[in-house]
Amino acid sequence: MEGRDDGGGKVIGLIEKATKSTAQEVDPRLLKAIKSIVRYSDSEVRLSSQTLMELMRHNHSQVRYLTLFIIDELFMRSKLFRTLIIENLDQLLSLSIGFRSNLPLPAPPAVATTLRSKAIEFLEKWNLSFGFHYKELRLGFDYLKNTLKLKFPDLQANAARIQRERQEREMKTKEILRNKFDSLRVSFGLFKYEIEVTIKEIKECMEIVQWRGDDGVPLAILDEEDFEEIRCSHLRQIRLDSLKQSEKVEETGENRIVFDVLREQCKLLVTKHLISVQEGISLLIRVDVSDNRTRDSMLKDLIDIRNNILAAKKKWEEAGFTMSRMTDIHGNEETNEEEEDIWEEDDGKVKTDSVKNVAHVMRTQQSENSSLPSSGEAKKSTSEARSNKVSNTKKVGSSGNSLRDKLISEAPVMNWGSQLTNWESTTEVRANYRGLEIESHWGRVDQDAIIPADKIAELNLQATVYREERTETPPCRASLKKGGLCQRRDLRVCPFHGPIVPRDDEGNTIIQESPLDESENQTSSTSGTNQDVSMDETTSDSDPNQLARQIAKEALKNIREKDKEVVRKRAKLVKVKVKEHNHEVLRGAAIASTSRSNAMDDEFDRVFAEKKNKKQTFSTRRKKTTAKDRISQRLFSNRVKGTNPQQLAQGNDEKCRDTSANQW
């Protein structure tokens, strides 16, 4: 009993610890410990089911979510636990799915949504596995799906669909592998022959390169006596390395053709044949055919071919013919040839770049001197050479530089891209520049297909979007009441201060004078300056008529000032007359409106009395009055006729509006 009590308390503690987490799943170690304790006895199963149902009543969706995970693990493994849970299935579904309106799922809402979807998924899984044995489980699933119309994930249909898709993919893969196997079986003899010929050519080239004539005896045999005298292992290893190094043959002008053939064959064997052999081996391992004898024989031959290729590769690597070394040698020769071509000019002048010249000079200095110069000296020499080069080019080609600077200033600025790499290039590019073997199920593949230069230029065409240059809009700079200047940036008119005009730092407008005013100012300034000059100086001037000109300018200035004063007084008088006229018009309009309103009231009273006292006589022959008749009668009435003179007066006022704009 004590052992059981200890186990019961332990399982309760583990379950509570597992459900207090904030993770998306239960800790696997705690779940494993719970399952191992529950497996101990039936009492542990009953205690765990009771504890889990109590935790499902907790007012937090995260606790219910983790509790549901533990229930699912134990439900799929224990028959007793299933029986105990199905007895309380109604309560479990309402607490996990929340289909009852009076028992909604607790907060947080995101975890509650996940709890609901997971509970629906677990219920469908339980029904698929144990619905045949438990009627309550079957009825609960049917009620939620058909009555409440809950959306289930339909695990069985999804599993069947996934299984069907996987089978279809496997069938397609088998069919593709079978077709590849048939094509490999047809061309296997030719494929094997090509690889054998390539390996044979590589061996013959290596024999030609390593042949030493009559002195073809290995150095190890000649030095066998000396080799026995060396007792130290370190010295012996150095001796072996030196012997191996002496066996390596360097590429020269005599054996260059053999090296080129060896380089091409090695590249073909590694980049093409070795990859094809490895693909064929993987194909034969995966393919499922009825004729296993043919497949096994082909697999054995491919393994032997792969071993021969690897052996040949190891042999030329031991001999010093590595691919990287051969390509480096070939590239260095090409660069040397290019440098020789650059130095051979018609006039004997050097036209290469300054940086290349400096680099060449540094290489010659390094080859002549055993000690290497420091980085500071190298930088100094490069800077001096560069400055000398720039000065020489400036002196020689000033006209060319001016034309180049002009073209650069007119040229548009573009972002660097791949289209500038092939600018005005007329070279054609191969479609399959990698040298791979491309297969196509739609037709024949041309391995030597090329892309013309005009097509490359069309593919590298770049579209640019026009961008308008941004111009800075000047601020309003009008003075504000609270101090400072207005900083609004409008194009023409500020909504608070009117048209935008040039202003100074204090907010005052800068008046832009007309050419006439400028001429007047110039004349006035000249006259002012001339007035300061004494009469003796003016008379002593070379021009005798200068005094007469000054007097004429002064008289003209006085006349203009008098004219301006007359115009100013006349405008002031007109303004006073307009003001008096407006006052008289307003006074007459006020008097006319009061008398007219009294006359209209008397007229309305008279008409209303006549209509009231008039006897209503109806005649069948009398013509009915229409709206048009009433309007015409109204227009020709005495009241309208009395207003005609006033309308004519209004017409006259409209005619005179332009002449006297401020008069009413």
UniProtKB/Swiss-Prot annotation:
Zn(2+) binds at residues 476, 486, 494, 497. The keyword Transcription does not apply. Its main location: nucleus. Residues 363-374, 388-402, 521-533, 640-650 have a biased composition (Polar residues). This is UV-stimulated scaffold protein A homolog. Signal peptide: none annotated. SUPFAM superfamilies: ENTH/VHS domain (SSF48464). GO terms for biological process: response to UV. Residues 377-387 have a biased composition (Basic and acidic residues). Residues 330-350, 362-403, 514-546, 640-664 are annotated as: Disordered. It comes from the Eukaryota. A zinc finger (UVSSA-type) spans 473-500. Keywords: Chromosome, Coiled coil, DNA damage, DNA repair, Metal-binding, Zinc, Zinc-finger. Belongs to the UVSSA family. Residues 10-153 are annotated as: VHS-like. Residues 148-180 form a coiled coil. InterPro entries: ENTH_VHS, UVSSA, UVSSA_C, UVSSA_N_a-solenoid_rpt. Pfam families: DUF2043 (PF09740), UVSSA_N (PF20867). Residues 334-347 have a biased composition (Acidic residues). It is found in: Chromosome.
